[in-house]
């Protein structure tokens, strides 16, 4: 029997083609194809040593990285079914996935470990430590029809479902996109805004480079427009993959000079509007702009424009080895130019969902994508709409009814419809249309209350940030909601622009230097050193209050003091859009240039405040980003409080320094004893004198 294990076949292909020493990933260090496959084989041995075998299930919840690729390949090498999970999901979604898969092992990292059962979770770092001490394992002998991996759908018709793909499926993706659409070669470098847990991103950043000898730029944090521009200027990718929302932001916020190396642009996830496609053509200097359509069930793109033939406003043509047809409501084939449901048939289509009894395909092997399209005489496919009520925002399918059920729990709301609306840039965003339950109407405070509740109960990408009040919802003659009529509405202002009276009347959030100036020019006789120390402390308070105030506004919290300053932004309910918006607002408040990435780099209100304070002071050395608290696993308390001690040293008088230094030396002798309770006592201290008293009491010094 020929071994059709895809991990083994990809390693064999790299060896035979001479790619082993060629870059596979820039992350930012170079990782070669040979290192990827060798690491995967060693990790396969680790999984075998831990008792995992063919047919077991593993849940992978890791950020994009070469390490995720190696762990995925290790599972495939051993015949283990790997489920890919979005690490940015709400903890309830992760709990569902753990129950759904009944995984023998959950592989994740850092704070996410606390979200899963201790008996099954393992930190990926531990696996890599073990892999460094073992030799590579052989590849399990498998047929091409063996289950390989599964990616989750967006859950538009109920709970998310995992589409199971086989070992042979990968090579269908490669034939369709790499060979027929993109003409990828080992010289190509890809950069994808879509993540690896997403079927689109998995192909872009994993299967395509490994199967063609090309390489990919990967980043553990979300790749927004500005991040993409930075990565592109550094690594010079030739193919840029994304979704329409991403590309709309690229055109608005970036310089075309950063993307001079790009030879083609690939868009998928939702239809690319003609206007945006034309803007992209101008921005990128006339290179191919390739729109297409794919699905989680198919595994990647099956209809696309190509580098040889592309047309703005069209999804392109069907790519071999796939077949498509358009089906009219009566089940007959729709003629040229007639709108109908898009059906697809081909070798990579998942035959079933995990834990789902209903078949995916017809008896003839056709999958109904639920996309409505039409095809002209020459085979060009044009997108019309979704056949169901699914909203596609940022290339993610969202079930609006899940959101609507939560919103209508609010007594002030009689009816609600959540739809995707188009911003002026061409990007899509969720908006909730609210019908008041009484003549009192719905004001901004009610909208903020709804927004806060949604942030605590849904994954961030499902939460609408725009709300509009309407007298009634548009409906058909038989009472069915006309979502299409709402999609054309002008977007309302985002919730964070609906400033409450509390915010407008002087709550923290806007920097000024009046208090600080008063300290310097105070009437009492103080030394210059004391004045400068007081100024530094006041600046720290002002900056922290500004960040906390802006964060509270965006969350709709009337009292900034109620917001946890050490909790990760993701745990507060921020998604990528909100994090970027916060950076924009802080830039306006401080007059600084605040990169969009610092919200992720510094992770929390406290961390971001430290960064801004250093920038305002003109410090030569940038504050080192630190991990924010996420769930139960937080920045070690001792480390956090030592940072506080360091900040307060500016107020130490010269005469006190020897005494303080001696006591801190005594403290060093107790570090190995792990006295975390002492750090908790420091947390309650607010001045250097209080901290010194704690040191005195701890070590018995007078």
Swiss-Prot record:
GO terms, biological process: Actinobacterium-type cell wall biogenesis; fatty acid biosynthetic process; lipid biosynthetic process; secondary metabolite biosynthetic process
InterPro entries, A to Z: ACP-like_sf, AMP-bd_C, AMP-bd_C_sf, AMP-dep_synth/lig_dom, ANL_N_sf, PKS_PP-bd, PP-bd_ACP
- Give the modified residues of type O-(pantetheine 4'-phosphoryl)serine: 576
Alphabetized UniProt keyword annotations:
Fatty acid metabolism, Ligase, Lipid metabolism, Phosphopantetheine, Phosphoprotein
UniProt pathway annotation? Lipid metabolism; fatty acid biosynthesis
| Keyword Transferase found | no
Kindly list the GO molecular function terms attached to this UniProt entry: acid-thiol ligase activity; ligase activity; phosphopantetheine binding
Enzyme class name: ligase
Name the UniProt record assigns to this protein: p-hydroxybenzoic acid--AMP ligase FadD22
Native source species: Mycobacterium marinum (strain ATCC BAA-535 / M)
User: What does the record give as the organism's lineage?
Assistant: Bacteria, Bacillati, Actinomycetota, Actinomycetes, Mycobacteriales
| Encoding gene per record | fadD22
């Amino acid at each position: 029997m020929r071994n059709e294990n895809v991990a083994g076949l990809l390693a064999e292909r790299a060896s035979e083609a001479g790619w082993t020493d060629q870059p596979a990933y820039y992350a930012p260090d170079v990782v070669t194809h040979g290192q990827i496959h060798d690491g995967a084989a060693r990790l396969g041995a680790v999984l075998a040593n831990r008792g995992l075998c063919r047919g077991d299930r593993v849940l992978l919840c890791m950020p994009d990285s070469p390490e995720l690729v190696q762990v995925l390949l290790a599972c495939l090498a051993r015949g283990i079914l790997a489920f890919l999970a979005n690490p940015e999901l709400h903890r309830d979604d992760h709990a569902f996935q753990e129950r759904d898969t009944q995984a023998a092992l959950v592989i994740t990292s850092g704070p996410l470990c606390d979200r899963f059962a201790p008996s099954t979770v393992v930190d990926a770092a531990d696996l890599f430590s073990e892999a460094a001490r073992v030799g590579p394992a052989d590849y399990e002998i498998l047929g091409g029809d063996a289950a390989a991996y599964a990616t989750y759908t967006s859950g538009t018709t109920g709970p998310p479902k995992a589409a199971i793909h086989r070992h042979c499926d990968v090579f269908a993706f490669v034939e369709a996109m790499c060979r027929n659409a993109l003409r990828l070669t080992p010289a190509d470098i890809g950069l994808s805004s879509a993540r690896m847990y997403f079927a689109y991103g998995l192909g872009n950043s994993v299967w395509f480079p490994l199967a063609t000898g090309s390489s990919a730029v990967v980043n553990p944090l979300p790749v927004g427009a500005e991040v993409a521009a930075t990565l592109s200027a550094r690594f010079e990718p030739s193919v840029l993959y994304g979704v329409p929302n991403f590309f709309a932001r690229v055109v608005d916020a970036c310089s075309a000079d950063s993307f001079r190396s790009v030879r083609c642009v690939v868009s998928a996830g939702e239809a690319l509007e003609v206007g945006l496609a034309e803007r992209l053509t101008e921005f990128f200097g006339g290179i191919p702009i390739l729109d297409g359509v794919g699905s989680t069930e198919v595994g990647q793109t099956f209809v696309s424009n190509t580098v040889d033939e592309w047309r703005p406003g069209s999804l392109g043509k069907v790519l071999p080895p796939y077949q498509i047809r358009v089906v009219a409501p009566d089940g007959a084939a729709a003629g040229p130019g007639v709108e109908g449901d898009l059906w697809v048939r081909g070798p990579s289509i998942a035959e079933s969902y995990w834990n789902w009894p209903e078949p995916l395909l017809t008896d003839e092997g056709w999958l109904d994508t639920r996309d409505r399209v039409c095809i002209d005489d020459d085979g060009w496919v044009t997108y019309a709409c979704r056949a169901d009520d699914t909203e596609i925002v940022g290339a993610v399918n969202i079930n609006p009814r899940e959101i609507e059920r939560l919103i209508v729990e609010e007594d002030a709301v009689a009816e609600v419809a959540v739809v995707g609306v188009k911003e002026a840039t061409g990007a899509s965003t969720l908006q909730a249309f609210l019908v008041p339950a009484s003549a009192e109407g719905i004001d901004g405070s009610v909208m903020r209350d709804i927004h806060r509740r949604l942030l605590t109960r849904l994954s961030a990408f499902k939460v609408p940030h725009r709300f509009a009040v309407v007298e009634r919802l548009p409906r058909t003659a038989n009472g069915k909601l006309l979502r299409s009529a709402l999609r054309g509405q002008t977007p309302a202002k985002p919730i964070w622009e609906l400033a409450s009276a509390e915010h407008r009347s002087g709550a923290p959030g806007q920097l000024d230097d009046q208090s600080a100036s008063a300290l310097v020019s105070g009437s009492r006789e103080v030394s210059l050193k004391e004045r400068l120390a007081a100024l530094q402390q006041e600046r720290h308070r002002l900056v922290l209050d500004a960040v906390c105030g802006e964060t509270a506004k965006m969350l709709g919290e009337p009292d900034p003091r109620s917001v946890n300053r050490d909790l990760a932004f993701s745990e507060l309910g921020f998604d990528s859009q909100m994090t970027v918006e916060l950076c924009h607002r802080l830039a306006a408040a401080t007059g600084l240039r605040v990169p969009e990435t610092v919200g992720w780099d510094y992770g929390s209100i406290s961390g971001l405040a430290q960064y801004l304070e250093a920038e305002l002071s003109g410090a030569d050395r940038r504050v080192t980003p630190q991990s924010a608290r996420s769930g139960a696993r937080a920045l070690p308390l001792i480390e956090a409080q030592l940072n506080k001690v360091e900040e307060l040293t500016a107020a130490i008088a010269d005469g006190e320094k020897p005494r303080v230094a001696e006591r801190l030396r005594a403290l060093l002798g107790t570090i190995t004893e792990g006295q975390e309770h002492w750090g908790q006592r420091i947390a309650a201290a607010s001045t250097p004198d209080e901290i010194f008293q704690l040191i005195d009491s701890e070590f018995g010094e007078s």
